[in-house]
Amino acid sequence: DDCLGMFSSCDPNNDKCCPNRVCRVRDQWCKYKLW
């Protein structure tokens, strides 16, 4: 499966961001997971 890179738009209900990235509802793009 391809994962979504940094700043890719994403769906918070179906988070396909790459490892150590997270899809936030507020932003709806993949960003670094800091914790």
UniProtKB/Swiss-Prot annotation:
Domain of life: Eukaryota
Cellular compartments annotated: Secreted
Pfam families xref list: Toxin_12
Tissue: Expressed by the venom gland.
GO function terms (MF aspect): ion channel inhibitor activity; potassium channel regulator activity; toxin activity
InterPro entries the record matches: Huwentoxin-1 (IPR011696)
Transmembrane segments: none
Keyword Iron: no
Keywords for the protein's UniProt record, in alphabetical order: Disulfide bond, Ion channel impairing toxin, Knottin, Neurotoxin, Potassium channel impairing toxin, Secreted, Toxin, Voltage-gated potassium channel impairing toxin
Keyword flag rRNA-binding: no
Main location: secreted
GO cellular component: extracellular region
Cystine pairs: C3-C18, C10-C23, C17-C30
Subunit and interaction comment: Monomer.
Domain notes: The presence of a 'disulfide through disulfide knot' structurally defines this protein as a knottin.
Homology family: Belongs to the neurotoxin 10 (Hwtx-1) family. 59 (Tltx) subfamily.
Function: Blocks Kv4.2/KCND2 voltage-gated potassium channels probably by shifting the voltage-dependence of channel activation to more depolarized potentials and by binding to the S3-S4 linker region of the voltage sensor domain.
Protein name stated in the entry: Kappa-theraphotoxin-Tb1c
